[in-house]
């Protein structure tokens, strides 16, 4: 499954005194099996971009093509329904949208609307919940008797229960404790590597971006100003400063180390493990 943006612009309240162009002339592509991160300041157009992915918003100008379905501002909703079945959208604080009295009913709500096999959906959701640290009897419990972090994880899996090909998540770990953050991010990564799903992550956490993403899209004032690998992105401190994007902690540690010892390691370390490996290699060659 491939999603392609061709010269996509979106204007809120078009034709009124309050009109605002949130994104303009966006050209990009998302492929199944890859992990994307979208970064940028608040108001840079990230949320508008992802809402155009599954036609929650339709382009004011330009086209969004999902496999063989082309979406314009004129496309009727009946033609978009197959797209929405294959693209799972997890917005910020999704736990606020929980409403069923048991986890099981929450899990089958989406699959039921799309006339999917409910037993398969329940089994798939149960496996994902177990991966997130829930007990075996979680399906019979009420989500409203759980902690905020548990409710967040329940809400995320309720979208994943539809087994979408592309998963879009907007700040999924905001406010979670460290263990829950790791569980959620590792689950998303496993869905990419083990099930060939595309993950599209909006995040302000550059540590997550560095560790998990294959490609990073940088947005500024409604435009894509960069689309590259994390290693290439974090090499250019001047551009990062211009885009108001911070460095991951491990990359900052590497730059501090290189400055202190007046040296240059052979590569950019995106994880603690990679930094240790580069450090040992540097020590060996001293």
Curated annotation (Swiss-Prot):
One of its GO terms (molecular function) is ATP hydrolysis activity. It comes from the Bacteria. Coiled coil: none annotated. InterPro entries: AAA+_ATPase, ABC_transporter-like_ATP-bd, ABC_transporter-like_CS, ABC_transpr_CbiO/EcfA_su, ECF_ABC_transporter_ATP-bd, EcfA2, P-loop_NTPase. Pfam families: ABC_tran. It is found in: Cell membrane. Residues 3-246 form the ABC transporter domain. Forms a stable energy-coupling factor (ECF) transporter complex composed of 2 membrane-embedded substrate-binding proteins (S component), 2 ATP-binding proteins (A component) and 2 transmembrane proteins (T component). CDD domains: ABC_cobalt_CbiO_domain1. It is an enzyme of class 7 (translocase). PANTHER family: ENERGY-COUPLING FACTOR TRANSPORTER ATP-BINDING PROTEIN ECFA2 (PTHR43553:SF27), HEAVY METAL TRANSPORTER (PTHR43553). ATP binds at residues 40-47. It is a peripheral membrane protein. Keywords: ATP-binding, Cell membrane, Membrane, Nucleotide-binding, Translocase, Transport. NCBIfam families: ECF_ATPase_2, PRK13646.1. The lineage of its organism: Bacteria, Bacillati, Bacillota, Bacilli, Bacillales. Its main location: membrane. Transmembrane segments: none annotated. It comes from Staphylococcus aureus (strain NCTC 8325 / PS 47). ATP-binding (A) component of a common energy-coupling factor (ECF) ABC-transporter complex. Unlike classic ABC transporters this ECF transporter provides the energy necessary to transport a number of different substrates. Its EC number is 7.-.-.-. This is Energy-coupling factor transporter ATP-binding protein EcfA2. GO terms for cellular component: ATP-binding cassette (ABC) transporter complex. Belongs to the ABC transporter superfamily. Energy-coupling factor EcfA family.
């Amino acid at each position: 499954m491939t999603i392609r943006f061709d010269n996509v612009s979106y204007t809120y309240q078009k034709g009124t005194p309050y009109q605002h162009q949130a994104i303009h002339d966006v050209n990009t592509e998302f492929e199944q099996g890859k992990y994307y991160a979208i970064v940028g300041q608040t108001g840079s157009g990230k949320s508008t971009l992802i809402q155009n992915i599954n036609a929650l918003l339709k382009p004011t100008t330009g086209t969004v093509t999902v496999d063989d379905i082309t979406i314009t501002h004129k496309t009727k909703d009946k033609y978009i329904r197959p797209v929405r079945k294959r693209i799972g959208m997890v917005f910020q604080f999704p736990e606020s949208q929980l409403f069923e009295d048991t986890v099981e009913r929450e899990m089958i709500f989406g699959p039921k609307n799309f006339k999917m096999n409910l037993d398969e959906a329940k089994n798939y959701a149960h496996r994902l919940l177990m991966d997130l640290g829930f007990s075996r009897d979680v399906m019979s419990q009420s989500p409203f008797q759980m902690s905020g972090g548990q409710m967040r994880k329940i809400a995320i899996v309720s979208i994943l229960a539809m087994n979408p090909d592309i998963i879009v998540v907007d700040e999924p770990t905001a406010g979670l404790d460290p263990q829950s953050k790791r569980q959620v991010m590792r689950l998303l990564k496993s869905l990419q590597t083990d099930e060939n799903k595309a993950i599209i992550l909006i995040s302000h956490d550059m540590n997550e971006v560095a560790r998990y993403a294959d490609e990073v899209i940088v947005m500024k004032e409604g435009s894509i100003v960069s689309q590259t690998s994390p290693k290439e992105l974090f090499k250019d401190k001047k551009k990062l400063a211009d885009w108001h994007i911070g460095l991951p902690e491990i990359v900052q540690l590497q730059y501090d180390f290189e400055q202190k010892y007046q040296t240059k390691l052979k590569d950019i370390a995106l994880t603690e493990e990679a930094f240790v490996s580069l450090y040992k290699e540097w020590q060996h060659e001293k």
